[in-house]
Structure formats: structure tokens, C-alpha cells
Amino acid sequence: MMNIKKLISASMVAVALSGCQRGAVKPNVLFILVDDMQADAIAALGNRDTYTPNIDRLINEGMAFTRAYTNGALCGALSMPSRAMLLTGRGVFEVQSDGMKIPASQITLPEHLKNNGYRTFATGKWHSDHASFARSFTEGDNIFFGGMHPYEENGHCAPRLHHFDPTGKYDEPPFVGQNFSSKVYADAAINFLKTTEHNNQPFMAFVSFTSPHDPRNILPDYGKKYCPAELSVPDNFLPEHPFDNGELNIRDEQLLPVPRTPEQLKKELSLY
């Protein structure tokens, strides 16, 4: 699956690394990830149903890597190894434990910047181990360790989070965020950016949203943006898969009953 993270983070990585190599003024890096968002959900890349002005501006004023793909995974959670690959520059066969653990021998991008004088801040999702997180960041807040916010815990509406632990242990139980996941991560990032205004030390802010990964909880205002009846279904839509590909009982296939109708799919698309 082609992910939106290639649109923003890869270009930021290139700028950061090239700037360091030239010995120029060290650039600040805002590294934004979103979870399970496909590139074909972006208006600037051809989707006529979506309204994505901020992402469109990044594309129109920068660049979009439209032929960049994740090269697979050896586990069910594709985001875990792909995040580890993105952070370390390693291929899928080089990351360990499918990315669940990043060994000290594999330096992450924020760790490299930290070792070169950067403040490194993180908020949101970290889908690897505590030790690699501790090596990578000097500060952070509203940190989520894991893959997704569970349905049974009210999903994005009650994210289980950690404050930054300078010991790197994170052995205290998580607290429940008092707002939607995207807002608590954005608020943490904004609060950090405010501290950089009069600080000459270069920084990297790693802002890792868990949306639009399911559960498809939505903020009330955003639920009104899209009318299901006005959305298009994909050209290759079928009520059910035409043959058993061996993956028909996985979690993603349980989100809607089969046979599926265009109306059901449009409703899910409006939530997505």
C-alpha cells in the first residue's frame, strides 16, 4: 500500500541529511506520519471526492513520490516493519522482529540527529520497542506505544498514552487522553514548537498520528464533511471477493459483512 508518509517525511529526510552533509546551517525537521492513509485519498493526487487542502499545498509547493511503495512485510501489521524501514533506512529483510525491536546497531534518523546536536521530540505512535524510542528522542509527550487504539477501549476517543520518561523505561501504566487522538498529538506538537521560538538549537519533531487507522471514530464536525451518497465506489468494487485468496478471515475483512453493497462502502468511505 502506498502511504501518505512518503509525501512528507521522505522529503524532510532528504533535506535534513543533505543539509548535514554540506555543513550548512542545520535545518529544523517536522516529520509527520499518518497511519493507514492511502495516497489515492488525496485530492492533489486525483481524488475528486476528498478535501485535503493542507496536504495538497505540500504537494503543490514540494514534491510527491508517486512511485514509492512499501516493499511488503513478514507480519500482519504492515506499518510496524515499514516504520522501522523508514526510520533506519533498512530493507524489510534487515529489520529485526518485523520492526517490533530496533537494535542499537541500527541507528534511527532521530537518533542520528540527536547525536549531532538536535533536540528530538516525539508525540503519537511508536510501533517499536521502548529502548529504541529512548535512544532516539530527548523529549516528548502524549506518546502511544502500540499498533492501534483498541475498539474495546473506545479507540481514538480515549487514547492510552505516556508522558515522556527520561529513564526510558515507561513502566508506569498509561493514562487516558481526554480528547481525540489526533488532537492530543497535535497539541503536544504545537506546545513543543512554541518552545523552539527563542531556542537556536536545531530540532526534529516526530509527529505520528494514529488516524485514519481504524477504529473509525470521528470528531462530530468531521463526520459532516462527506455525504455518503455523493461519494464514488472504486471501479473494481465487487460485493465479495471472487475467490478464496487465503486472507478472507483477517480482521480487515470482518469490518463489513459480505456480500457488501455500494451503500455500505460509501458509508465507510465517508467515515474514513
For the regions a language model picked out, list residue spans one by one.
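Formylglycine-dependent sulfatase
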Residues: 2-8, 20-272
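Hydrophobic helical h-region of N-terminal Sec-dependent signal peptides
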Residues: 9-13, 17
